A protein has these predicted regions:
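Core catalytic lobe of class I
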Residues: 1-4, 10-254
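Class I S-adenosyl-L-methionine-dependent methyltransferase module
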Residues: 126, 262-265
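Conserved SAM-binding loop
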Residues: 257
Length: 265
């Protein structure tokens, strides 16, 4: 059970602190709207997958439009067709998000985590150095790798598969962290979702998140994710007997994720 201190009152030099019992909550809010209502030092784990800020600037979406309009494949110097003919336009949730937005959220993560609380953030592998710098106030930085056992075979005939793994950084807000594991390499092999089970472009593995939650928290602890998307973090917390506070601003994904967690069809 998690109790949040909501206010303090002083009468005749005596201070009384008022608390409320925290229950799991899945809400339609932006990241800062959600995080701003969370008291400081009250969260055991932030487990999240923010927008990777990769939709714009890559040129890949424009190249896809070029092909759709009847344009020719651009030849790679090695003579092969350009293997990047895929859109990376994940929608408004990624297009409008910036590094400054991520930095504001990370500052809030640090505020709301208890001493010894953990933060795990999945992010674009090519921007991991930037993420590490944003997490400089945290300690015990470690890499986590999700190896996909059934990756989409992009570039399969040209080079190594380009989407066969994802990287996260795990770190701690001072204090002694909860870590229910030993000799852990931080490498996890799980499949991605396909077909009707997949409705979000960056949907994460449920068993992966269940394993991470069990290692970094104990039953009854509170897990926060302000970018819950498909609802995976909330469902993983629910399945492992943890409390969750999760937010999603998109109408479409909020409803789909909420229905998934609440098992509404």
């Amino acid at each position: 059970m998690v109790w949040w201190k909501i206010k303090s009152k002083t009468f005749f030099n005596l201070t009384f602190e008022l608390y409320m019992n925290m229950e799991s909550s899945y809400v339609k809010k932006t990241d800062i709207e959600l995080l701003s209502i969370v008291p400081k030092n009250s969260v055991d784990l932030v487990l999240t997958d923010p927008p990777y800020i990769i939709s714009k600037g890559s040129g890949m979406d424009e190249y896809k439009k070029h092909l759709d309009a009847g344009g020719e494949h651009v030849k790679h110097p090695d003579g092969s067709k350009n293997s990047l003919a895929l859109t990376t336009d994940f929608g408004e949730w990624d297009n409008s998000y910036t590094i400054d937005d991520l930095e504001k959220a990370i500052n809030e993560f640090y505020r709301i985590l208890r001493p010894g609380g953990s933060c795990i953030i999945f992010f674009d592998i090519w921007k991991i150095e930037t993420l590490t710098k944003l997490l400089s106030k945290f300690s015990k930085h470690r890499f986590i790798e999700w190896v996909k056992t059934n990756p989409v075979p992009i570039n399969q005939y040209a080079t190594y598969l380009s989407n066969a793994r994802e990287i996260a950084i795990s770190c701690v807000k001072g204090g002694k962290a909860t870590f229910n594991s030993k000799y852990d390499k931080g490498i996890y092999e799980y499949p991605i979702y396909h077909g009707s089970d997949r409705f979000h472009p960056t949907q994460k593995s449920l068993p992966l998140f269940e394993e991470l939650i069990k290692k970094h928290t104990n039953e009854g602890d509170l897990v926060v994710d302000p970018y819950v998307g498909s609802g995976t973090t909330a469902l993983a917390a629910k399945n492992t007997n943890r409390l969750y506070l999760c937010g999603e601003p998109s109408d479409e994904y909020f409803q789909k994720g909420y229905n998934r967690v609440k098992k509404i069809t």
